[in-house]
A protein has these predicted regions:
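Short acidic low-complexity segments
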Residues: 109-118
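Short "lid" loop at the C-terminus of a central beta-strand within the Rossmann-like core
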Residues: 128-130, 163-168
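Conserved beta-strand signature within the Rossmann-like core of class I S-adenosyl-L-methionine
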Residues: 154-162
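Conserved alpha-helix/loop element of class I SAM-dependent methyltransferases that forms part
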Residues: 38-56, 73
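A short SAM/SAH-binding and catalytic strip from SAM-dependent methyltransferases
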Residues: 121-140
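Class I SAM-dependent methyltransferase SAM/SAH-binding core
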Residues: 61, 68-110
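N-terminal, positively charged/glycine-rich alpha-helical extensions of SAM-dependent methyltransferases
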Residues: 1-29
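Class I S-adenosyl-L-methionine
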Residues: 170-215
Length: 215
């Protein structure tokens, strides 16, 4: 990406937006754009369903990890079955907040715009929601290219969420995705084993993509 690239410009703006949120709210769900912790936990619960119950141990990548809330959730749910976690983010401020609050040998945090290492599962929560003034078609292409790259580094599965198009109104700076279109994309380009979760109270959906049939 170059500075003339609309995606690069958007990512710079998103980085600054979240750094400002963190300065205002601290290590709180509002800093990463969520209404409250309760709704954040609902999202994490849906995403974590990608983990196969037969797994004796697994590693996780978290792309757009913010201050590391997903690690705390996964560590609490999986315990010793979570053997390693890498959180990626474009905001050094967010990563510093994560490192200050999370003291675990299982967790590490990496600054970057791409996932560079493999893991059993990759989680992407809210990372694609803000597009700022980027054209929707450009952002859609960026999301799908990113999902291809992330899935290539996911040994067992990928879980991500996006804002749904089934809403009463839309905000211009946010990206809304048709769940049926993305289900088709995942089936055609990622895996035969795809689950769309769109039965919870938030204005979004979650996609679970497995390399093998789930338990």
């Amino acid at each position: 990406m170059t500075q003339d690239d609309p995606i690069a410009r958007a990512l710079d703006g998103i980085r600054d937006l979240y750094a400002g949120n963190l300065a205002t709210h601290g290590r709180d769900s509002k800093s990463v754009g969520w209404k409250d912790e309760a709704s954040q936990l609902v999202r994490f619960d849906r995403l974590a369903r990608v983990v196969d119950g037969r797994d004796a141990g697994c590693t996780a990548n978290d792309w757009g990890c913010g201050y590391g809330a997903m690690f705390s959730f996964l560590d609490g749910r999986l315990g010793d079955a979570l053997t390693g976690y890498t959180g990626y983010d474009i905001s050094q401020d967010m990563l510093d907040a994560a490192a200050r609050s999370i003291d675990s040998p299982k967790a590490r945090f990496v600054l970057g715009r791409e996932v560079t290492g493999e893991a059993d599962y990759t989680f992407v929560s809210g990372t694609f929601n803000v597009k700022l003034d980027t054209a929707a078609a450009d952002w859609d292409r960026y999301v799908k290219d990113s999902l291809r790259a992330i899935y290539a580094r996911s040994r067992r599965g990928l879980a991500f969420n996006l804002l749904t198009t089934y809403v009463d109104w839309k905000q211009d700076t946010l990206f809304y995705a048709d769940p049926s279109e993305f289900f088709d994309f995942c089936k055609r380009h990622l895996s035969r084993y795809v689950t769309l979760v769109h039965d919870y109270q938030l204005y979004e959906w979650t996609m679970l993509v497995h390399r093998e049939p789930s338990a």
